Regions:
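Extracytoplasmic loops and strand-loop junctions of Gram-negative outer membrane beta-barrel proteins
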Residues: 1, 25-31, 79-87, 95-96, ...
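Hydrophobic, lipid-facing positions within transmembrane beta-strands of outer-membrane proteins
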Residues: 4-10, 26, 41-47, 96-100, ...
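Repeated loop/turn-to-beta-strand initiation elements of outer-membrane beta-barrel proteins
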Residues: 19-22, 54-57, 108-112, 164-169, ...
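Transmembrane beta-barrel strands of outer-membrane/channel proteins
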Residues: 24-30, 59-63, 81, 102, ...
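Gram-negative outer-membrane beta-barrel transporters
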Residues: 118-120, 138-222
């Protein structure tokens, strides 16, 4: 299977006043496969507003298209998961993501943030109930269903940015699910996505002993 992609990207930053900054961009893409062409226009915009000296708000919107899909038929991650491209039958996955966050820098050398997001997806792929790729991947287009997905969550973070010891600690509460046509996968009812992680904690610490020696430690909980 041969495919070709042509893409272009442009962005610019705007400082409207001393408090308000804006970033706007767009990604244009043309993907050609099996005598079928898919064109996508993917705009993105982000804005930051400085409420007071130590408090800022940030919001963003991003539209994306993806020309490969991840297919897996097991409830756990396997090395045999398949990445498959779009075809004449299989459309690109498209998503719209919104985010809103607040940032506090009132303590010297520290930054605290809270950010929420919501992502809506369409043309997501899953194997039909009772079907898997084991044995052969031939004819996989007839073994899958296309549906909708969503992902949402909130992340809290504390970050130390100055001094010999730096790092950050974050906690994320999130949810990701899928929904297919009635009579299809799970009889059309929403169900958790395979890689749904409701709670996650990440800790990273770096310490610089001198100009030549530093050490870093990371820990993650899912």
């Amino acid at each position: 299977l041969y495919a070709h992609e042509i893409s272009a990207y442009a962005e610019d930053n705007f400082r409207l006043n001393t408090r308000f900054r804006l970033n706007m961009g767009a990604h244009l893409s043309l993907f050609h496969v099996q005598n079928k062409s898919y064109f996508s226009f993917q705009p993105r915009i982000s804005a930051r507003y400085q409420l007071v000296k130590d408090i800022a708000l940030k919001t963003s919107y991003t539209q994306m298209s993806q020309y490969v899909h991840l297919l897996s038929s097991m409830p756990i991650s396997m090395p045999t998961d398949l990445w498959v491209p779009v075809t004449q039958k299989i459309k690109p996955m498209q998503s719209h993501q919104f985010s809103l966050g607040g940032y506090y820098t009132g303590i010297k050398g520290w930054e605290f943030s809270a950010e929420g997001y919501y992502k809506a997806m369409r043309n997501v792929l899953e194997y039909k109930d009772g079907v898997s790729f084991f044995g052969t991947s031939a004819g996989w287009e007839n073994k899958v269903e296309m549906g909708k997905g969503r992902s949402m969550g909130i992340e809290l973070m504390a970050q130390k940015t100055v001094g010999k010891t730096t790092g950050w600690l974050s906690y994320t509460l999130s949810k990701s699910d899928r929904k297919f046509a009635k009579g299809g996968i799970n009889n059309g009812e929403r169900f958790p996505y395979k890689y749904d992680r409701r709670h996650s904690i990440n800790l990273t610490v770096n310490h610089q002993f001198n100009d030549r020696i530093d050490i870093g430690v990371s820990w993650a909980f899912y």
